[in-house]
Amino acid sequence: MKRGVLLNAPLSALVARMGHTDEITVCDAGLPIPAGPERIDLALMAGTPSLETVLTALLTDLVVEKVIMASEIKQISPAAHQALVDQLEAHAAAQGKPITIEYCLHEAFKARSHQSKAIVRSGEVTPYANLILCAGVAF
């Protein structure tokens, strides 16, 4: 049995394949998922698992240097936005490397998701609760 924190086989394999600047989209239950990127569907029911839980799991193994969010989250879902920013800032401190946060319009976010290695669907139902994680390097 695997010893690490991240036990989900498809997620673990995805993280192992990531190179510097490769991207993973972590999305809510409603984001349209394009053909092309690998689809890892973790959604069980509304709210389960939450985006925060999926992000926590991924951050146990993935070095992240940049995160992209839809700018609409700041106005439409401010509490969720602040929780994500807090989580990312805490992780940046723990990994000893900064994480840049960038914003774009939701339509541009959806277009950008097409270049992700994979799209990981959570059960999150908060509007605009979607992230693109850009991989950093561990050295």
Curated annotation (Swiss-Prot):
Catalyzed reactions: beta-D-ribopyranose = beta-D-ribofuranose
Record: residues binding substrate: D28, H106, Y128, A129, N130
GO molecular function per UniProt: D-ribose pyranase activity; intramolecular lyase activity; monosaccharide binding
SUPFAM superfamilies cross-referenced by the UniProt entry: RbsD-like
Active-site residue list: H20
E.C. number: 5.4.99.62
Pathways per UniProt: Carbohydrate metabolism; D-ribose degradation; D-ribose 5-phosphate from beta-D-ribopyranose: step 1/2
Claim: Transferase is one of the keywords in the record: no
Gene Ontology BP terms: D-ribose catabolic process
Broad EC category: isomerase
GO CC term (a single one): cytosol
Entry-linked InterPro entries: D-ribose_pyranase (IPR023064), RbsD-like_sf (IPR023750), RbsD_FucU (IPR007721)
Keyword Cytoplasm carried by entry: yes
Localization (cell): Cytoplasm
UniProt keywords, alphabetically: Carbohydrate metabolism, Cytoplasm, Isomerase
Function: Catalyzes the interconversion of beta-pyran and beta-furan forms of D-ribose.
NCBIfam families referenced in this protein's UniProt entry, alphabetically: PRK11797.1 (NF008761)
Family recorded in the similarity comment: Belongs to the RbsD / FucU family. RbsD subfamily.
PANTHER family: D-RIBOSE PYRANASE
Subunit structure: Homodecamer.
Name of this protein: D-ribose pyranase
